[in-house]
Structure formats: structure tokens, C-alpha cells
């Protein structure tokens, strides 16, 4: 029974790494190709893409992705700007 738990844990860890890599690649694509075309318009420090990179690297793809989505939902003209670091 223990071998199956180890195997499922290994698969889950591999899946987490794969999803994290895809999310980081998407942010990298945005920063390299789309952001120069759109210009800087983020209301926060750090920028939303830098926030996303740090959140995913620090908290993993699930919580980091959720934090990034919440941050993106707050980045609009009706929200006050300012410093919004990734939480611990």
C-alpha cells in the first residue's frame, strides 16, 4: 500500500511541476511578446507579471496561480494603485 502512495505522490509532484512550468512560460511569453506591444500600464508595484512569477515560484502553481488571478482582477482603473507584494 505504501508503494502506491509514493507513486501517487510522485505523480502529483510531477503534475505540479508541469503546471508551474506552463504558467511560468505563459507569463514569460506575455512579458517578451505582448507587454512591449501593450506598453506599461500596471497600477501596482511589483507589476502583475512580476507578481505572478514570484507567487508561482514561492507558493506553487495552485496557490500562486490563484493569487495571480486575484491580483489581475484588482488591476483596473477603479482600484487605487500602490505597493502590493506577494503574501507569505
From Swiss-Prot:
GO terms for cellular component: plasma membrane. InterPro entries: Membr_insert_effic_factor_YidD. It is found in: Cell inner membrane. It is a peripheral membrane protein. Keywords: Cell inner membrane, Cell membrane, Membrane. It comes from the Bacteria. It holds the Pfam family YidD. Its main location: membrane. Could be involved in insertion of integral membrane proteins into the membrane. NCBIfam families: membrane protein insertion efficiency factor YidD. Belongs to the UPF0161 family. HAMAP family: UPF0161_YidD. This is Putative membrane protein insertion efficiency factor. It comes from Prochlorococcus marinus (strain MIT 9313). The lineage of its organism: Bacteria, Bacillati, Cyanobacteriota, Cyanophyceae, Synechococcales.
Amino acid at each position: 500500500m505504501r508503494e502506491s502512495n509514493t507513486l501517487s505522490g510522485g505523480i502529483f509532484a510531477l503534475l505540479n511541476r508541469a503546471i508551474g512550468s506552463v504558467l511560468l512560460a505563459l507569463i514569460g511569453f506575455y512579458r517578451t511578446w505582448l507587454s512591449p506591444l501593450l506598453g506599461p500600464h500596471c497600477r501596482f508595484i511589483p507589476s502583475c507579471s512580476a507578481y505572478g512569477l514570484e507567487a508561482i515560484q514561492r507558493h506553487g502553481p495552485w496557490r500562486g496561480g490563484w493569487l495571480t488571478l486575484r491580483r489581475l482582477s484588482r488591476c483596473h482603473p477603479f482600484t487605487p494603485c500602490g505597493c502590493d507584494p506577494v503574501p507569505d
